[in-house]
C-alpha cells in the first residue's frame, strides 16, 4: 500500500505481562509516527500458540490505553489493511511462499526431524554452527512432485544466495553487512502450514505499508534475511531502527521469563504511569539540543522533541533509583487534590481509624517517592507499636528519656487547650513553639519527643505537630499521656 506518510507498528505477542522493553518499543514506534504526523498501528502476533497466554491480549490493550499510546489502526478499531490479528491472516502466507517457490527463490524441504537432528548433532560434534545443509535445495521438479503426491510432510525454505553480501542501513547502528554464506536457508512455512515469525512479519509489514520498523537489537542478525525476502518479492525495504537491549545489570538482560519488571509490576508497586513512561523513554534515548539537560517530559512533549538519532547503541541498564527519582518528581508536581486521590487507596490499606487525610497528604507529598511505600509509613496510626524509651535520646535535638518526659509534661496543657484548633497546623505549631520559647528551649527539644510519643518511630511522614493534627486532639492526648506513663517506668 503506497503511502507518503510514516507508518509504524507495535506488534506484540500475547505471552503475558507487558515487559519494560516491549513498552519502550511501543513508545518509540508511537513517537516516531506522531512526531511526523504519521500512523501508529497495533498488530497482535499470536501465531505461536504454544506461548499464548489467556488474557494477555487484554493486558496489551489496557497497558497501551493507560499509557496513552493510542493506535490509529488495530484489531478493535479496524483500518484499511486488516485484519490486525496475525492468526486471522493465515490464508495468505502460504500463497506468498509458494510464489517464491515458483520463482526459484524458495523450495520445498522434505527432510525429517530425525535427519535434521542427526545433521545438527554431527555439526556440533565437529565444532560447527548448526545449519541446514541444503539437501532439498536442488531437488528436481519431478522429485518434488513425487514427494507431494505421496503426502510427505514438508517445510518451505528461503533459498539464500550462497555467494555475495547482503547489507542494510540502520538508523542507530549504521551500515551492516553479512556474508550470504553465513546465513541459513530459513524456514518460511512450517510443516503445519503456519508461517514462521520472520516470514509473517515481512509479509504483514509490507501489506500494511509499514515504512519504519522499530524493534530490539536482537533482530539485527535476522535483518539481512528479512531484506532478502523483500528483494525476492520486489518490495520496498523499510527504514530500520534497532534499539539497544534493556539490561538488569552489566551481564543480564531484563526478562519476562526471569520475573523482571513489567509495567504491571511497577504500577502495582505504586509508580505513576506517566513516570514509568518518562523513565522508559530515557532508557537508551536522550533528547538533543535545547532539551538535552531536561529529564521530565509529558507524552506530548516527547512527541515534540522525539528524534531516533537520540537512541544509543549501548545497552541501557534499568536503574530503580533513577525511576524512583523521576516518580518522586511527578508526585511533587501533582496538585494536593490529585495527590490525595492517588494516595488514598494506599492510605486506606494501613489506616482504618479517623484521620485528616488531606493534612496527612500535605505531609506525605513532599516526602513520598513511591505510593506503594505509604502503608508501611502509616502503620502506627491504628495502633501504637511497642518501642523502647531509648528512642527519645537524640544528640542533635539534645534530648534524653528524662528530658522527653519533661517536654511532654510541658506540652500536655498546651495540647489540651480547647481553644487550640487541631485543623490548623500552623496554630498548633506556633502554640508549641511558644511553649519552647517560654522554657528557653529549642523547638526540637520539645517536638522531637512529641513525634516519638505519637508514633513510636524515629522517622515519620511529618513532625510531631503534623502528626498531632492528622490524628486529632483526642488520640494525641491519649498517646502523650501513655508516653509520659511509659517514661515514668
Positions of PLM-derived features:
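Small-residue-rich helix-loop
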Residues: 336-439
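Conserved phosphate-binding loops in nucleotide/dinucleotide-binding enzymes
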Residues: 83-87, 110, 189-190, 208-219, ...
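N-terminal Rossmann-like or analogous alpha/beta NTP/dinucleotide-binding catalytic cores
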Residues: 2-125, 222-235, 275
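Charged substrate- and nucleic-acid-binding regions of tRNA-handling and nucleotidyl-transfer enzymes
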Residues: 426-488
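Residue-level signal for inorganic ion chemistry
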Residues: 29, 60, 100, 104, ...
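Active-site cores that bind ATP or allylic diphosphates and position pyrophosphate for catalysis
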Residues: 102, 107-242, 248-254, 262
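Glycine-rich phosphate/pyrophosphate-binding loops
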Residues: 34-46, 199-212, 233-247, 460-466, ...
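Structural motif
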Residues: 20, 266-274, 313-319, 352-360, ...
Amino acid at each position: 500500500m503506497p503511502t507518503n506518510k510514516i507508518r509504524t507498528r507495535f506488534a506484540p505477542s500475547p505471552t503475558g505481562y507487558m515487559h519494560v522493553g516491549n513498552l519502550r518499543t511501543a513508545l518509540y514506534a508511537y513517537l516516531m509516527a506522531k512526531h511526523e504526523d504519521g500512523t501508529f498501528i497495533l498488530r497482535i502476533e499470536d501465531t505461536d500458540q504454544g506461548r499464548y497466554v489467556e488474557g494477555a491480549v487484554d493486558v496489551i490493550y489496557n497497558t497501551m490505553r493507560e499509557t496513552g499510546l493510542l493506535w490509529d489502526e488495530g484489531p478493535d478499531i479496524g483500518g484499511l489493511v486488516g485484519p490486525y490479528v496475525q492468526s486471522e491472516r493465515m490464508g495468505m502466507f502460504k500463497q506468498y511462499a509458494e510464489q517464491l517457490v515458483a520463482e526459484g527463490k524458495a523450495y520445498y524441504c522434505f527432510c525429517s526431524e530425525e535427519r535434521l537432528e542427526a545433521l545438527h548433532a554431527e555439526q556440533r560434534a565437529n565444532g560447527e554452527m548448526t545449519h541446514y545443509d541444503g539437501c532439498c535445495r536442488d531437488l528436481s521438479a519431478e522429485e518434488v512432485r513425487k514427494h507431494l503426491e505421496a503426502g510427505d510432510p514438508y517445510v518451505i525454505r528461503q533459498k539464500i544466495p550462497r555467494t555475495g553480501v547482503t547489507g542494510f542501513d540502520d538508523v542507530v547502528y549504521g551500515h551492516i553487512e553479512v556474508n550470504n554464506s553465513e546465513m541459513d536457508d530459513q524456514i518460511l512455512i512450517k510443516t503445519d502450514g503456519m508461517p514462521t515469525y520472520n516470514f509473517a512479519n515481512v509479509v504483514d509489514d509490507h501489506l500494511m505499508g509499514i515504512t519504519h520498523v522499530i524493534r530490539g537489537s536482537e533482530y539485527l542478525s535476522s535483518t539481512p534475511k528479512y531484506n532478502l525476502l523483500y528483494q525476492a518479492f520486489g518490495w520496498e525495504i523499510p527504514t530500520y531502527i534497532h534499539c539497544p537491549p534493556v539490561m538488569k545489570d552489566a551481564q543480564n538482560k531484563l526478562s519476562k521469563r526471569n520475573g523482571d519488571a513489567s509495567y504491571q509490576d511497577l504500577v502495582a508497586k505504586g509508580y505513576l504511569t506517566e513516570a514509568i513512561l518518562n523513565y522508559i523513554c530515557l532508557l537508551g534515548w536522550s533528547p538533543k539540543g535545547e532539551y538535552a539537560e531536561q529529564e521530565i517530559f509529558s507524552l506530548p512533549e516527547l512527541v515534540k522533541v522525539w528524534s531516533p538519532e537520540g537512541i544509543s547503541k549501548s545497552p541501557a541498564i534499568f536503574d530503580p533509583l533513577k525511576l524512583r527519582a523521576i516518580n518522586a518528581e511527578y508526585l511533587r508536581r501533582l496538585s494536593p487534590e490529585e495527590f490525595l486521590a492517588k494516595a488514598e487507596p494506599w492510605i486506606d490499606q494501613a489506616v482504618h481509624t479517623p484521620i485528616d487525610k488531606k493534612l496527612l497528604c500535605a505531609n506525605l507529598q513532599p516526602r513520598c517517592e513511591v505510593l506503594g511505600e505509604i502503608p508501611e509509613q502509616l502503620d502506627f496510626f491504628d495502633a501504637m507499636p511497642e518501642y523502647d524509651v531509648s528512642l527519645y535520646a537524640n544528640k542533635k535535638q539534645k534530648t534524653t528519656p528524662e528530658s522527653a518526659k519533661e517536654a511532654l509534661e510541658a506540652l500536655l496543657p498546651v495540647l489540651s487547650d480547647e481553644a487550640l484548633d487541631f485543623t490548623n497546623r500552623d496554630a498548633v505549631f506556633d502554640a508549641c513553639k511558644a511553649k519552647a520559647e517560654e522554657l528557653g528551649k529549642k523547638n526540637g527539644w520539645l517536638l522531637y519527643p512529641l513525634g516519638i510519643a505519637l508514633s513510636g518511630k524515629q522517622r515519620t511522614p511529618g513532625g510531631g505537630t503534623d502528626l498531632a493534627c492528622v490524628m486529632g486532639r483526642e488520640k494525641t492526648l491519649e498517646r502523650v499521656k501513655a508516653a509520659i506513663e511509659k517514661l515514668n517506668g
